[in-house]
Amino acid sequence: MEYRSLTLDDFLSRFQLLRPQINRETLNHRQAAVLIPIVRRPQPGLLLTQRSIHLRKHAGQVAFPGGAVDDTDASAIAAALREAEEEVAIPPSAVEVIGVLPPVDSVTGYQVTPVVGIIPPDLPYRASEDEVSAVFEMPLAQALHLGRYHPLDIYRRGDSHRVWLSWYEQYFVWGMTAGIIRELALQIGVKP
């Protein structure tokens, strides 16, 4: 698939044709979810945030809006939508959820469900000062180009773990966020 010419219709048809298989065992019992917000444009964008440097975990990292599934959340999808509203003021009613990717285990002990949703191009994002220092949009075609991601093997507690690294403008995209973007690319048939 040629990533440079990716339209929203191309993305949607490929995502719908290749629905993710979600059959995974996990050791992580705490649940979390992130929203992968794809901005509806002729050449779609991918909305990302940079976490506040004042946070205890993952300070300053590029991330999708998201967080832990609360008792008040009916599902992982509900949690992703709630967190997106809290972090960047995306109203849940403005998100067209098109599916989920297979859950990912985080190094902090969560099983994270990536929720893919389409959002309008004219939303007035408002970053939560406590949680988010920046909100930015990356062209989806660039984000899904697998050649931009570089592997790094990390050894932690006797286990090897591969993380992916990339830059977009001044933003360093790595770890779980880069891994989820790569999984999205592979899901729609982008070849490594």
From Swiss-Prot:
It is an enzyme of class 3 (hydrolase). A motif (Nudix box) lies at residues 67-89. PROSITE patterns: NUDIX (PS51462), NUDIX_COA (PS01293). GO terms for biological process: nucleoside diphosphate metabolic process. Disulfide bonds: none annotated. Its EC number is 3.6.1.-. The keyword Flavoprotein does not apply. This is Uncharacterized Nudix hydrolase NudL. Residues 29-160 form the Nudix hydrolase domain. Probably mediates the hydrolysis of some nucleoside diphosphate derivatives. Mg(2+) binds at E83, E87. It comes from Escherichia coli (strain K12).
